[in-house]
UniProtKB/Swiss-Prot annotation:
This is Isoaspartyl peptidase/L-asparaginase. PANTHER family: ISOASPARTYL PEPTIDASE_L-ASPARAGINASE, L-ASPARAGINASE. Belongs to the Ntn-hydrolase family. It is found in: Cytoplasm. GO terms for biological process: asparagine catabolic process via L-aspartate; proteolysis. GO terms for cellular component: cytoplasm; photoreceptor inner segment. Has both L-asparaginase and beta-aspartyl peptidase activity. May be involved in the production of L-aspartate, which can act as an excitatory neurotransmitter in some brain regions. Is highly active with L-Asp beta-methyl ester. Besides, has catalytic activity toward beta-aspartyl dipeptides and their methyl esters, including beta-L-Asp-L-Phe, beta-L-Asp-L-Phe methyl ester (aspartame), beta-L-Asp-L-Ala, beta-L-Asp-L-Leu and beta-L-Asp-L-Lys. Does not have aspartylglucosaminidase activity and is inactive toward GlcNAc-L-Asn. Likewise, has no activity toward glutamine. One of its GO terms (molecular function) is asparaginase activity. It catalyses: L-asparagine + H2O = L-aspartate + NH4(+); Cleavage of a beta-linked Asp residue from the N-terminus of a polypeptide. Keywords: Acetylation, Autocatalytic cleavage, Cytoplasm, Hydrolase, Protease. It is an enzyme of class 3 (hydrolase). The active site is at T168.
């Protein structure tokens, strides 16, 4: 089986030219990291974790060190990861003071009998596992402080159909052994209520992975994604014989018509077919397969280049 990794940097509204370049660099870097892990014989789980860590470490994206702020001006992050081989899953929500929530989600998957830990319980588990704690203010950027003030003035968190509230990072992968996995991570919605949890850590909404079907990671307005169970809905269409592109169009179209939700997704099937689709204005994405790197941000700017 030829390995593949696909990554996304979150659905978004119009993006400035200079920020597009920075996001392009970040998304390509993440795909290259994930694909490098696969080429060296790493697992799909290793690849999606590595790709998402690269995005969490990039302040251009709404995850990890780039996470947006809640109403109290603090960072609360959500993440989940799933192994399609045996449907193992790990998720965390409302976590603070750690650099890479996706690493903690994987520890939940591999080191506990549970699927999901939240808030103080997740923090206690992180400490027990030796995950380094960092001061919360180190995750707060000046850019996101200004963004919060603007959103408070406009009551942005209440604008559920507004593209500026879209943002997540994610990855899906298929490895040499035919195993699939997904990972998704986010800082959530700007000016969200303290303790708000979106789709990202909820398996079936923020992502899903099953070797019998494929893997998916979603992005967009979390409440809308939760309402339609976007990830599992898309894989259901694939189970029913739809192509990955048809399945993506059907599920995104349903979310838009049924609950007026905008978003995007990346999918890889068990046979290695893949797609990146979105109904928001833009979505940074990249895919690496067969020594080629495919990437884009807007619907009409897809490019292909050779991988190093």
């Amino acid at each position: 089986m030829n390995p593949i990794v696909v990554v996304h940097g979150g659905g978004a509204g119009p993006i400035s030219k200079d920020r597009k370049e920075r996001m392009h660099q970040g998304i390509v870097r993440a795909a290259t990291v994930g694909y490098g892990i696969l080429r060296e014989g790493g697992s799909a789980v290793d690849a999606v974790e590595g790709a998402v860590v690269a995005l969490e470490d990039d302040p251009e994206f709404n995850a990890g060190c780039g996470s947006v702020l809640n109403t109290d001006g603090e960072v609360e992050m959500d993440a989940s990861i799933m192994d399609g081989k045996d449907l193992s899953v790990g998720a965390v929500s409302a976590v603070r003071c750690i650099a890479n929530p996706i690493k903690l989600a994987r520890l939940v998957m591999e080191k506990t009998p549970h699927c999901f830990l939240t808030d103080q319980g997740a923090a206690q588990f992180a400490a027990a596992m030796g995950v380094p704690e960092i001061p919360g203010e180190k995750l707060v950027t000046e850019k996101n402080k200004k963004r919060l003030e603007k959103e408070k003035h406009e009551k942005g968190a209440q604008k559920t159909d507004c593209e500026k509230n879209l943002g997540t990072v994610g990855a899906v992968a298929l490895d040499f052994k035919g195993n699939v996995a997904y990972a998704t991570s986010t800082g959530g919605i700007v000016n969200k209520m303290v303790g708000r949890v979106g789709d990202t850590p909820c398996v079936g909404a923020g992502g899903y992975a099953d070797n019998d079907i494929g893997a998916i990671s979603t992005t967009g307005h979390g409440e809308s994604i939760l309402k339609v169970n976007l990830a599992r809905l898309t894989l259901f269409h694939i189970e029913q014989g739809k192509t990955v592109e048809e399945a993506a169009d059907l599920s995104l179209g349903y979310m838009k018509s049924r609950v007026k939700g905008l978003g995007g997704l990346i999918v890889v099937s068990k046979t290695g077919d893949w797609v990146a689709k979105w109904t928001s204005t833009s979505m940074p994405w990249a895919a690496a397969k067969d020594g080629k790197l495919h990437f884009g941000i807007d619907p009409d700017d897809t490019a292909i280049t050779d991988l190093p």
